[in-house]
């Protein structure tokens, strides 16, 4: 167990003439967490950004807009000198902006042209079956032209009964109709067409035969599409060419922006500045040295004496080894520890994977999930993903350990065992189940441990693990309280719970062992523990006594969730092998289907093997374990600086 790194509150004071050098020095070392200044009656006020702040912000917005448009993502860094990036920035940024703007504008025009061509095509398509030049549809003084579609069937006899002077073009399939009649007969013909559900269509204004026009439009569409694709290809080549420059420029401008805007967070007067913040105590001397070097000793750096109230609000920097560090993700998911309390990362480094492994306990699933985690860790470069994959790997190590204890591989038993129907063979020849002793309810305790045959024993073991876990929490709570309120409070508030458990244990052993002295002694210890608890926590303490049993019984989920995984795997195996050997003598025709069932079934159970054990192991940490000692609510230590990836000084 460890506590967060010891922090020192420091103040940097100096003349405004050295503010920029001070900011540069603090940013470069990336070790100083700056507290935002809140204006008060002291006479100090927040200042304005540096003169280059607005220009830097505009360039940063532009470079990020370009990066977003091009779809540029983080990649394996090509480290460049920041000075070189800044020298080329204006030229390359303007060139890139002009080029992309020109190409995107052209693409936009071409896409509008495509939409126009599509609209022209939609106008022509209804007339495609009528091979008549559109010039013939207009320009008549004595003729009326009806162009559209009808719902019913149109016969020439219907027209000829009205007038003999007509010209009809009609397609029975598309119901398209073009009808030329004398204007004197137009009203009667219109009444006829209306009765057939006539719907007038717009006649294209251009001349030409529909089929030829359609061919021309499609050729034009293909040409425009090719030009668009060509321009998009050119833009994609810009992405390849300028990706490193854009990533490096974004980094350099982000750094310059941070520096330029820092005056908005610190106290300044007409001539002086004050920067207030925190640093790890081990880094304080380095900050003094770097700031003095950057300002030629003109800045004053000092540490402040901390009061208890200030410690409560100190930012928290974890103090864990590289191996334990991934568990900080689990801590941050819940809440970062306060500066004044224990950091349980080291504890859950053991307890979380252990409980996960105890639940899953299958070598086959552990190998699959472990391999998957290693592959993702290698392929995905994200700093957010790697710790999660490390946690998954830790869990699979414990899963393999328990898989050996349980003798399980994808739901199969590795060791042969005696059953009511005779000897059940295991996957490993010669490995037989050994009976060690008789356990709870007449169950035989064996090696390997067959969980489905030792349910009561496994429940008892799970609850025992829970009690150990809970008492570890009480010990951590004891340490936290002893540090802040003294041993007496720690003994009354947390030690009393352990004494109560001891009393119950002694009384139970005395009762079942027939030793009355133990029974009475246990009862006395229990009463003493309850009195101490009442003194420490008031009436709330005894009221919470039943919760201890509830917390302990919550750990029975270890065996419950584990058994569900076993039964799913066993069911998949039974179905698959029943399909392969339907009569237990020869392989059946459904072997391929059985293999699919086997793969899909175990694939689904593999996914569940991440979710179910993970969630339940996490719940036991957050609810049962943390509930005994942990408050959380700490602030993240966020130093002023930037972790460079694509540039260097």
UniProtKB/Swiss-Prot annotation:
Miscellaneous comment text of the record: This organism has both a Na(+)-translocating F1F0 ATP synthase and this H(+)-translocating A1A0 ATP synthase.
Main subcellular localisation: membrane
Subcellular locations according to the entry: Cell membrane
Keyword Cytoplasm: no
Transmembrane intervals: 348-368, 391-411, 422-442, 458-478, 498-518, 519-539, 558-578, 592-612
GO cellular component, one term: proton-transporting V-type ATPase, V0 domain
Organism this protein belongs to: Methanosarcina mazei (strain ATCC BAA-159 / DSM 3647 / Goe1 / Go1 / JCM 11833 / OCM 88)
Membrane topology label: Multi-pass membrane protein
Gene Ontology terms, MF aspect: ATPase binding; proton-transporting ATPase activity, rotational mechanism
Function, in words: Component of the A-type ATP synthase that produces ATP from ADP in the presence of a proton gradient across the membrane.
Keywords (A to Z) from UniProt: Cell membrane, Hydrogen ion transport, Ion transport, Membrane, Transmembrane, Transmembrane helix, Transport
Entry's Gene Ontology BP terms: vacuolar acidification
Protein name: A-type ATP synthase subunit I
InterPro entries to which the protein is assigned, alphabetical: V-ATPase_116kDa_su (IPR002490)
PANTHER family in alphabetical order: V-TYPE PROTON ATPASE SUBUNIT A, VACUOLAR PROTON ATPASES
Description of how the protein assembles with itself and partners: Has multiple subunits, A(3), B(3), C, D, E, F, G, I and K(x); there may be a few other subunits as well.
Family listed: Belongs to the V-ATPase 116 kDa subunit family.
């Amino acid at each position: 167990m460890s506590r967060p790194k010891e922090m020192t509150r420091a103040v940097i004071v100096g003349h405004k003439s050295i503010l920029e050098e001070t900011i540069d020095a603090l940013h470069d070392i990336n070790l100083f967490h700056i507290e935002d200044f809140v204006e008060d009656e002291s006479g100090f006020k927040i200042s304005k950004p540096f003169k280059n702040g607005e220009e830097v912000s505009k360039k940063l917005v532009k470079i990020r807009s370009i990066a977003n448009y091009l779809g540029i993502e983080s990649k394996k860094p090509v480290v460049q000198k920041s000075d070189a990036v800044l020298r080329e920035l204006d030229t390359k940024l303007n060139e890139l902006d002009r080029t992309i703007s020109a190409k995107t504008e052209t693409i936009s025009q071409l896409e509008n042209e495509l939409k126009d061509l599509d609209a022209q095509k939609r106008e022509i398509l209804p007339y495609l079956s009528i091979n008549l030049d559109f010039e013939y549809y207009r320009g008549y003084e004595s003729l009326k032209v009806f162009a559209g579609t009808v719902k019913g069937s149109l016969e020439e006899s219907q027209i000829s009964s009205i007038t003999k002077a007509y010209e009809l073009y009609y397609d029975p399939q598309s119901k398209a109709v073009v009808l030329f009649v004398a204007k004197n007969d137009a009203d009667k013909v219109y009444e006829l067409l209306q009765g057939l559900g006539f719907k007038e269509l717009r006649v294209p204004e251009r001349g030409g035969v529909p089929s030829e026009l359609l061919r021309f439009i499609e050729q034009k569409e293909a040409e425009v599409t090719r030009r668009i694709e060509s321009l998009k290809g050119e833009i994609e080549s810009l992405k390849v060419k300028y990706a490193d420059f854009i990533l490096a420029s974004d980094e350099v401008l982000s750094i310059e922006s941070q520096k330029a805007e820092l005056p908005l967070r610190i106290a300044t007067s007409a001539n002086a500045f004050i920067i207030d913040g925190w640093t790890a105590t081990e880094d304080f001397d380095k900050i003094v040295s770097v700031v003095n070097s950057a300002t030629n000793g003109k800045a004053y750096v000092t540490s402040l004496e901390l009061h208890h109230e200030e410690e409560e609000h100190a930012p928290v920097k974890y103090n864990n080894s590289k191996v334990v560090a991934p568990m900080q993700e689990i801590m941050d998911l819940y809440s970062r520890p306060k500066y004044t309390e224990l950091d349980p990362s080291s504890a859950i480094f053991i307890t979380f994977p252990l409980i996960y492994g105890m639940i899953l306990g299958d070598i086959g699933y552990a190998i699959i999930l472990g391999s998957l985690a290693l592959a993702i860790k290698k392929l995905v470069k994200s700093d957010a993903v790697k710790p999660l994959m490390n946690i998954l790997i830790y869990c699979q190590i414990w899963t393999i350990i328990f898989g050996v204890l349980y003798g399980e591989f994808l739901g199969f038993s590795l060791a042969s065992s005696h059953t009511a129907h005779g000897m059940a063979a295991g996957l490993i020849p010669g490995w037989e189940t050994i009976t060690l002793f008789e356990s709870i309810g007449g169950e035989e305790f064996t090696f390997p441990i067959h969980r489905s045959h030792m349910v009561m024993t496994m429940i008892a073991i799970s609850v025992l693990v829970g009690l150990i876990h809970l008492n570890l929490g009480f010990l951590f709570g004891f340490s936290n309280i002893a540090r802040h309120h003294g041993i007496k409070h720690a003994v009354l508030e947390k030690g009393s719970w352990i004494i109560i458990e001891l009393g119950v244990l002694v009384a139970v052993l005395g009762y079942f062992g027939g030793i009355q002295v133990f029974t009475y002694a246990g009862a006395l210890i229990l009463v003493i523990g309850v009195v101490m608890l009442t003194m420490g926590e008031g009436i709330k303490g005894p009221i919470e006594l039943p919760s201890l049993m509830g917390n302990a019984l919550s750990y029975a989920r270890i065996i419950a969730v584990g058994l569900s995984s076993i039964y799913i795997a066993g069911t998949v195996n039974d179905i698959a092998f029943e399909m392969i050997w339907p009569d237990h003598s020869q392989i059946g025709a459904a072997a391929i289907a059985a293999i699919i069932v086997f793969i899909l079934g175990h694939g689904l159970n593999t996914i569940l093997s991440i979710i179910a054990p993970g969630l339940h192991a996490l719940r036991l940490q957050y609810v049962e374990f943390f509930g005994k000692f942990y408050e959380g609510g700490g602030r993240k230590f966020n130093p002023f600086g930037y972790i460079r990836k694509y540039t260097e000084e």
